[in-house]
Amino acid sequence: MSKTIAINAGSSSLKWQLYQMPEETVLAQGIIERIGLKDSISTVKFNGNKEEQVTDIPDHTTAVKILLNDLIHLNIISAYDEITGVGHRIVAGGEYFTDSVLVDEKVIEQVEELSALAPLHNPGAAAGIRAFREILPDITSVCVFDNAFHMTMQKHTYLYPIPQKYYTEHKVRKYGAHGTSHKYVAQEAAKMLGRPLEELKLITAHIGNGVSITANYHGQSVDTSMGFTPLAGPMMGTRSGDIDPAIIPYIIERDPELKDAADAINMLNKKSGLGGVSGISSDMRDIEAGLQEKNPDAVLAYNIFIDRIKKFIGQYFAVLNGADALVFTAGMGENAPLMRQDVINGMSWFGMEIDPEKNVFGYRGDISTPNSKVKVLVISTDEELCIARDVERLKK
């Protein structure tokens, strides 16, 4: 038996989950927030308990020390060396990595080099890797890449219809994201359906604050909605998703608040989507409250959101030449029955029917009717477990 910790580090946060492996038992989980700021917060949840402390955590190395000391103080572990593996979630792995890898200095440097593809994620992830290597230099350390699952896409799918020099010289292409989540829920869907993953055609819809849809053919990603960056695809919580690129120079010329392309991209990433259109919130619960109040901006934002998700699902039915199941996962995918119902409404031609009672009452699993030709599943994603499994796989 061994203990493995899954890490999701950002620029100012470090989310973690500790597992007993190979049993896959969660021993504890938590998050350290406001790294580098005053009044940092460390939260640990274990055995139904919750411990929280407020202190100053200037950097990721200090954060890791506090995390490990908390585990000892709370008797979750008795010594550092009980942890034999650590897995780090990396958003952007570019074309360097088609699978999870053991960490060495070259891997860390490549993660840092790819920060342009994920400026909010890769630098923090690299800092987290270095912190663990400094404090626990002898444990198995693994990088798990969000886009690696999508590296099975064919060239005609991942290349953009622009001059090829931008790919050959600058590696501009579709990379995708949320791959760890899409991989996990596809595996769970196969178990739920009682069929080998290698014979299934699945459409997996990761719908949280970030939204991505993936076409999965026999266990492999053949297309996905996120692109060169996670900005592409359907409308999201604060991201616009796909727009006509000519809009960017047009609005820069006319909006004095947008000084350059970086400002415009920031607006598309952080001030658009549900929040930007509604003017209310990026949270679907607030949007649904707006629907009840018949707020016209909430109604408009919601309708755009549903429309864009439907279109990607329809595309992937075409890409796969039909599907065995549609899987909803992540925050909204798992917890927004109205959204699921409205996505499915009007898609009866594809052979999908959901049971209203199963859908509304938070049923996890198959929410489709017995007559539904395409099964509709709700599956809780578990990216952390997927990371821990990859650590165990690479230990052997």
UniProtKB/Swiss-Prot annotation:
Top-rank taxon: Bacteria
SUPFAM superfamilies registered for this protein in UniProt: Actin-like ATPase domain (SSF53067)
Molecular function as annotated in GO: acetate kinase activity; ATP binding; magnesium ion binding
Presence of the UniProt keyword Metal-binding in the record: yes
GO CC annotations, alphabetized: cytoplasm
Coiled coil, from the record: none
Co-factor binding comment: Mg(2+). Can also accept Mn(2+).
Annotated catalysed reactions: acetate + ATP = acetyl phosphate + ADP
Binding site for ATP: 15, 206-210, 283-285, 331-335
InterPro entries registered for this protein in UniProt: Ac/propionate_kinase, Aliphatic_acid_kin_short-chain, Aliphatic_acid_kinase_CS, ATPase_NBD
Pfam short name (any one): Acetate_kinase
Active-site residue list: 146 (proton donor/acceptor)
PROSITE patterns xref list: ACETATE_KINASE_1, ACETATE_KINASE_2
Single Gene Ontology BP annotation: acetyl-CoA biosynthetic process
Pathway: Metabolic intermediate biosynthesis; acetyl-CoA biosynthesis; acetyl-CoA from acetate: step 1/2
Family: Belongs to the acetokinase family.
HAMAP family hit by this protein: Acetate_kinase (MF_00020)
Function: Catalyzes the formation of acetyl phosphate from acetate and ATP. Can also catalyze the reverse reaction.
Protein's recorded name: Acetate kinase
Organism, as annotated: Streptococcus uberis (strain ATCC BAA-854 / 0140J)
